[in-house]
């Protein structure tokens, strides 16, 4: 029995170390330049057994809001011990250091740029550390610093040896809608591959504030009038009868955010919600209760 228990402990320990070699990348580097290749090459040189997963390299330039949304959608499907390198708006300075977020058993390496507050919504259980760096100067800090922090995590270095607990990280409230007596005011936080427009208004918030009331929804100038929570789709093929290709409808997407979609949207033909209606990230989304 003792030998069997030792074997199980050994297997579990090895599984944990395997998980800590999973490293994801979320950047705004695009695919044209050498940056992504250099970053992966550095990681494989430092961590030969690394398993690297691309979340996205097409994040809109400097948009930590978009990066936070994409990582929210992906991280929950990775095992504990996964390391996430966030390479958007990652420049460092004397005033802005490199941070390590420990959240739900996973590690997130990011500059102090507001990402942590956007990603965690200030939920309990988030541990933040200001990482100890001898020199913050680099024209490519994700390559110079984030990769080496990932290496030390994979080597089993305790988090406490990498930095000090930190609570003064930058707070940005882009994800938080404003709630008033007769209205919710939100904004567009993401436009997906199909041109569907994602707001920062969640199903839970809308249910809580609607209290059975009907409402009008406005994505910039486009409106969906006299709706209710129960009438909003939860699948893209669940749209109302009578809608044809090109018509807009409301849906709670996979992450339970309110989204305006276009039936059979294809940006290369008749377009998605964003192109047809001239909607951009940052535009206002409002819900007026009737």
Where are these regions (language model features)?
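Active-site histidine-anchored catalytic micro-motif
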Residues: 22, 46-49, 66, 79-80, ...
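Anionic-ligand-binding alpha/beta catalytic cores of soluble enzymes and soluble regulatory domains
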Residues: 137-210
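N-terminal glycine-/serine-/threonine-rich phosphate-binding loop
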Residues: 17-95
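A conserved acidic, glycine/proline-rich C-terminal tail/linker
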Residues: 200-278
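Fold-independent oxyanion-binding glycine-rich loops
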Residues: 27-29, 55, 87-90, 103-104, ...
């Amino acid at each position: 029995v003792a030998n069997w228990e030792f074997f199980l402990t050994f297997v579990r320990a090895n599984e944990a170390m395997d998980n800590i070699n999973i490293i994801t990348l979320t950047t705004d580097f695009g695919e044209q330049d050498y940056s992504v290749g250099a970053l992966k090459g550095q990681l494989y040189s430092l961590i030969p057994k690394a398993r690297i997963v691309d979340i996205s390299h097409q994040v809109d330039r400097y948009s930590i809001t978009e990066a936070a949304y994409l990582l929210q959608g992906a991280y929950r499907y990775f095992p504990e011990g996964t390391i996430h390198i966030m390479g958007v708006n990652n420049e460092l300075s004397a005033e802005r250091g490199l941070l390590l977020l420990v959240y739900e058993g996973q590690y997130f390496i990011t500059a102090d740029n507001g990402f942590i507050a956007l990603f965690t919504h200030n939920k309990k259980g988030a541990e933040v550390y200001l990482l100890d760096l001898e020199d913050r100067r680099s024209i490519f800090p994700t390559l110079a610093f984030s990769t080496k922090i990932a290496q030390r995590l994979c080597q089993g270095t305790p988090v406490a040896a990498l930095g000090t607990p930190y609570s003064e990280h930058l707070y940005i409230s882009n994800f938080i809608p404003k709630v008033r007596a007769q209205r919710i005011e939100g904004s567009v936080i993401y436009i997906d591959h199909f041109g569907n427009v994602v707001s920062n208004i969640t199903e839970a918030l809308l249910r809580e504030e609607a209290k059975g009331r009907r409402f009008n929804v406005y994505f910039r100038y486009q409106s969906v009038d006299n709706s209710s929570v129960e009438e909003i789709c939860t699948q893209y093929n669940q749209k109302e009868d009578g809608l044809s290709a090109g018509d807009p409808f409301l849906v709670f997407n996979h992450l339970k955010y309110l989204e305006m979609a276009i039936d059979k949207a294809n940006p290369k033909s008749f377009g998605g919600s964003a192109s047809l209606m001239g909607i951009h990230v940052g535009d206002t989304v409002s819900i007026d209760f009737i």
